[in-house]
Amino acid sequence: MCASPSTAPGFFNPRPQSGAELSAFDIGLSRSMGLGVPPHSAWHEPPASLGGHLHAASAGPGTTTGSVATGGGGTTPSSVASQQSAVIKQDLSCPSLNQAGSGHHPGIKEDLSSSLPSANGGSAGGHHSGSGSGSGSGVNPGHGSDMLPLIKGHGQDMLTSIKGQPTGCGSTTPSSQANSSHSQSSNSGSQIDSKQNIECVVCGDKSSGKHYGQFTCEGCKSFFKRSVRRNLTYSCRGSRNCPIDQHHRNQCQYCRLKKCLKMGMRREAVQRGRVPPTQPGLAGMHGQYQIANGDPMGIAGFNGHSYLSSYISLLLRAEPYPTSRYGQCMQPNNIMGIDNICELAARLLFSAVEWAKNIPFFPELQVTDQVALLRLVWSELFVLNASQCSMPLHVAPLLAAAGLHASPMAADRVVAFMDHIRIFQEQVEKLKALHVDSAEYSCLKAIVLFTTDACGLSDVTHIESLQEKSQCALEEYCRTQYPNQPTRFGKLLLRLPSLRTVSSQVIEQLFFVRLVGKTPIETLIRDMLLSGNSFSWPYLPSM
């Protein structure tokens, strides 16, 4: 056990009361007063009882203690005086140990002199730099803890200053701080340089980071997010191959969004936020489509989602004539004749083509894409229209319309035709069993029309986005209009793949051979698209 500083021999305690503290101002001298050098006789060896704390005092002159060398000078009164001044100065100003001492109580000169020789004999005039060589390199950190118990009785302020002395009142030395800051600045600089060297994959501007799966600038990031969140659809005034770079990226929004998707920016990475209540309708983006006042059938309760409801409204208004007008061609409770069946079939096909020409976004596609889409899906649209108007499908009139009664044929061919008629009837009846309303039929036809399975499409990405828009509209409509049928949307979508089981050749043979003979339906579809309103069939009276 070490001797307590207050009871050690030769130690003068000016305040023997318990818990008393002594600060630099309690000494009673002016701060600017000089420190006198004591006579040589004042310096003596420390008592043996304190040897555990003052082991450095036994070192002879010129001894190097710790990592700091004395330069061979030993312990001198002048060096100790400098250390005394540094210790007392610590109480007033912690960060510096370089200044000269000021003021010392003459009554404790001998007591401090018995403890201070344990410090290194060199000058205390500098910070410990960690070099371990040269005079004046600072107080040895290894002996600051040895001096700590002896100075404790003189006040808590001096204790704090002595604790901070070995490291210069900090956790690191100036040299280590400099090295650390230099390494950090170099690392951060290399990171900044690496970011600055990455270009936006869309326009080539400086990238601000990875957004939605790719490195892009802030402009392209905001443009892509805005386009996806609002389901915006653009049109190109050129050949849909506009240059997208830093100087031309704002000239064509269609080609810019197309390049964003082409370079790998993901739609699903954009978080769906709230659509602003003042969002412009579809009529603002496509002036040729005007929404009349009032909601069509099935849209009245769809007010919470104005954008999707407007889209469905446009799909419904694109019908060339109301569904109720189909009833004029049918005779209730009676089997339709051959002429009535052919007339109704012609109207259904013509209605599908005219509807496609008037719905949003389809006329903006290239003519080659329009023809390719309708050639592929015309039979599916025909089945949907047949189900929507509750077209009667009796076997005998269908066989008669196909001309199978007029010419003898093999039994296996008749059986095959009967199977195709049965498949056609099943698809129509399954759709009718779901009680699909007009808005749902319009969305289903849009989903069928905007397919990417057609060959030779020039803009697959844009067509796919239109199909996704139609699916979103149908899903939201089913959720709001049929809240008690959570599986309705899924059931409707599952009916679409089955529509392709109905052979287009069979439909053509059953309904159109009497009208066009051997002319392919695909040729008629192209003529209807290119002729505008001048196209007419013999079974298309004015409605």
UniProtKB/Swiss-Prot annotation:
Molecular function (Gene Ontology), one example: RNA polymerase II cis-regulatory region sequence-specific DNA binding
Coiled coil regions, renumbered to chain: none
SUPFAM superfamilies documented for this protein: Glucocorticoid receptor-like (DNA-binding domain), Nuclear receptor ligand-binding domain
Cellular component terms (Gene Ontology): cytoplasm; nucleus; synapse
Main location per the UniProt record: nucleus
Biased composition (Gly residues): 122-141
Name of the protein this chain belongs to: Steroid receptor seven-up, isoforms B/C
Organism, scientific name: Drosophila melanogaster
